[in-house]
Amino acid sequence: MTKQTEYKRKPEWLKIKLNTNENYTGLKKMMRSKNLHTVCEEAKCPNIHECWAVRKTATFMILGAVCTRACRFCAVKTGLPTELDLQEPERVADSVVQMGLKHVVITAVARDDLKDGGAAVFAETVRAVRRKNPFTSIEVLPSDMAGVEENLKMLMDAKPDILNHNIETVRRLSNRVRARAKYDRSLEFLRRAKEMQPDIPTKSSIMVGLGETREDLIEAMDDLRANNVDILTLGQYLQPSKKHLPVIKYYPPAEFAELKEIALSKGFSHCEAGPLVRSSYHADEQVRSAKEKTAEAK
């Protein structure tokens, strides 16, 4: 077995306690009954049991379950996507009511087959959730929508409470990790979002363990801050299958703590960093912290 395909043994700090209580099974049944998808399941998130069973939160994945891209870190299915489901926004909104969520994250597969990248359905989902859940904060996590400004404007005009778009990795590794996305296009996407709606916090995420250096990570932090990104999440990359990129390094919790301190010193209003941190992990706490910092700055 070559170094590139070898599975590294996971360290103790990555072992997860599984919890499949009534909250977990109830949420799973509800998602199936409403024909909805979650990135928690599709992307094999390691926190699914904590979020579903303990925190009773979930990240809805709209626009189908098949992505038009094939990023080498991601477990989501790729291929020819299904037709748009125009009733999906209302079903998501109804599910948020049923779950009693105070904060909801809405993400989507990349839909490069659509002229608007799925922006219209994304925006309508935000509006539907807002109509039926006026006190629920809404976080959106879109693809770069091919970098088309009109698509981003359509989404930002729906006034989500937070705009999240992930650069995923450092500049040096970006082409290898996500060939059909572009590092600078993602930075521009984040910058334009802030220009369109200055009061809406922006957020991005970086996976570590793909071969990046500390200098690479600091450069990425500087790039995000130069484009006015407010919140950063840092988490350990975990190889979904042998077909995906291998893990080069497992970062210990102490190193994540160091990276968090560096990020906060750069001016991020909030940084969530840890081995099991994912973009939507404790998202409700992140948006609350960012809004408090924004209010203090005024």
UniProtKB/Swiss-Prot annotation:
Keywords assigned: 4Fe-4S, Cytoplasm, Iron, Iron-sulfur, Metal-binding, S-adenosyl-L-methionine, Transferase
Enzyme class, first EC level, given as a word: transferase
Subcellular location: Cytoplasm
Stretches assigned to the Radical SAM core domain: 53-269
GO CC annotation terms, alphabetical: cytoplasm
EC number: 2.8.1.8
Primary site of residence: cytoplasm
Gene Ontology molecular function: 4 iron, 4 sulfur cluster binding; lipoate synthase activity; metal ion binding
Tree of life domain: Bacteria
Entry keyword annotation includes 4Fe-4S: yes
Protein name: Lipoyl synthase
Species this chain originates from: Bacillus cereus (strain G9842)
Record lineage: Bacteria, Bacillati, Bacillota, Bacilli, Bacillales
Gene designation per UniProt: lipA
